[in-house]
Amino acid sequence: MRIDINRIEKEEDIKLLKELKWNGFVFYQYDDEFSKDRYEEVKAIAESYKLKVYSGVKIKTESSKQLRDKVKKFRNKCHIILIEGGVLKINRAAVELHDVDILSTPELGRKDSGIDHVLARLASNHRVAIELNFKTLLNKDGYERARTLLFFRNNLKLAKKFDVPVVISTDAENKYQIKNPYDLRAFLNTLVEPLYAKKIMETAYKICDFRDYLMRDNVVRYGVEIIKEEKE
């Protein structure tokens, strides 16, 4: 399934996602604005267009302790937890936690990609995905865009070497930023081989499906479920 990660909430924009052949999306909010009611409103609209919607929260902080506290606070309130990266200690804290799903924009505001061999190993061990944020690339031009592409390539090389999950997102906030999933796939094909590009396109759904399973009422933890006995 093709699952995007974005902040789309208007009906006309959600309708466009359907027309562009997305199967669903993660609707994320920042931790300081998180509202379950807002997610439920988006979910109701999306389901009317037969789109699968998952709730997400993006945590933005420069404190490792605050990051851990917020992850603990939101883990059972939403499907996907993203951490806004850029600060090296935050990048590291994010990939050290099993409860974090995605490290977003690890290169943000940096002169390097934000990921090295050590962080790649940690991300692999804890199954924390690294995000390729397409909007950050489009919002740059000239040298800055070329440098961001270089960072993407570096992180993809490390991710493949250490078996780190990778996701790609449009991070769209309006209909003008929404992209066709086939365009994202074509973009990935310029960076990596086609089979790896296909794998990246499928990763967001796999993470969402795993978290959706863990949020079921009868699931204690992965592989442990409470089964109700049928009365004779």
From Swiss-Prot:
Pfam families reported for this sequence: RNase_P_p30
Catalytic reaction(s) noted: Endonucleolytic cleavage of RNA, removing 5'-extranucleotides from tRNA precursor
Highest taxon, organism lineage: Archaea
GO cellular component entries: cytoplasm; ribonuclease P complex
InterPro entries: Pol/histidinol_Pase-like, RNase_P_comp-3_arc, RNase_P_p30
Annotated GO MF terms: ribonuclease P activity
Subcellular location field: Cytoplasm
GO biological process: tRNA 5'-leader removal
UniProt entry tagged with the keyword Nuclease: yes
Gene3D superfamilies linked to this entry: Metal-dependent hydrolases
Subunit structure: Consists of a catalytic RNA component and at least 4-5 protein subunits. Forms a subcomplex with Rnp2 which stimulates the catalytic RNA.
Function: Part of ribonuclease P, a protein complex that generates mature tRNA molecules by cleaving their 5'-ends.
NCBIfam families: RNaseP3Mthcoc
Protein name per UniProt: Ribonuclease P protein component 3
Originating gene: rnp3
